[in-house]
Amino acid sequence: MLSLENKTFTWSKDKNRDNIKNHRLSFREAAPVFLDPYLVVLHDQAHSTMEETRWKGIGVLHNDLLLSIIFSEEKEDVIRLISAREATKKEKEDYRENINRIFGTQ
């Protein structure tokens, strides 16, 4: 568990271990992506269920690494991290397009 900017982040120890093994990134390291003021958040309809709505966030960490992070909200201020990895080329393009829309640039 980690608290950051009035949010609490939780995760499964097993999922975190798998994420470190598969993506070389812990959830504790990935959580600050939520501080990115331009974080793109999309509904992850393919993996959502009636019991759990999942979201995909694309944002920059403090070290300029662009991440894709899957999460759900357990309560208003509790975010459960499910997966985190470096963004794909397409996700990076989506993020840049969002920045361009915000600032009106090409």
Segments predicted by a language model, with ranges:
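Ribonuclease/tRNase effector modules and their secretory precursors
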Residues: 1-106
